Amino acid sequence: MVLPLSLLKTAQNHPMLVELKNGETYNGHLKACDSWMNIHLVDVIFTSKDGDKFFKMSEAYVRGSTIKYLRIPETVVDLVKTEVNEVRRQQQREQSRGRGGGRGGRGGHRGGGGNRGGRGGAR
């Protein structure tokens, strides 16, 4: 499963189309995004909702809550899939190694602690 934010992070510096809920579209290169899916585009072509007006802008900032959908190149989707698979493989390797479990892990020996913490007092 690919999370939308990881897809957006990978799509930085790639072209994308952003359609808003009101029908307007922004075509440009993704410069940055945040956890609310607010998007900063550069080299943007804005198209009005009826499609008869076009504006070229050096940059645009789109609020995440107004976005209807994003169109991202297939190559970016493939990049994300390979990154996700690599992270999974790395996590499996770490789990199979075993960390701190079994003999000799954290916590030390649970036997008699010598003169520490016993009842009675000093002799």
From Swiss-Prot:
Pfam family, any one: LSM
Predominant location category: nucleus
Localization of this protein: Nucleus
Domain Sm: 3-76
A biological-process GO annotation: mRNA splicing, via spliceosome
GO molecular function, one term: U6 snRNA binding
Family annotation (SUPFAM superfamilies): Sm-like ribonucleoproteins (SSF50182)
Highest taxon of the lineage: Eukaryota
Keywords assigned: mRNA processing, mRNA splicing, Nucleus, Ribonucleoprotein, RNA-binding, Spliceosome
GO cellular component: cytoplasm; nucleus; P-body; spliceosomal tri-snRNP complex; U2-type precatalytic spliceosome; U4/U6 x U5 tri-snRNP complex; U6 snRNP
Keyword check for Secreted: no
Family: Belongs to the snRNP Sm proteins family.
Role played: Plays a role in pre-mRNA splicing as component of the U4/U6-U5 tri-snRNP complex that is involved in spliceosome assembly, and as component of the precatalytic spliceosome (spliceosome B complex). The heptameric LSM2-8 complex binds specifically to the 3'-terminal U-tract of U6 snRNA.
Record note on quaternary structure: Component of the precatalytic spliceosome (spliceosome B complex). Component of the U4/U6-U5 tri-snRNP complex, a building block of the precatalytic spliceosome (spliceosome B complex). LSM2, LSM3, LSM4, LSM5, LSM6, LSM7 and LSM8 form a heptameric, ring-shaped subcomplex (the LSM2-8 complex) that is part of the U4/U6-U5 tri-snRNP complex and the precatalytic spliceosome.
The protein's name in its UniProt record: Probable U6 snRNA-associated Sm-like protein LSm4
Organism annotation: Caenorhabditis elegans
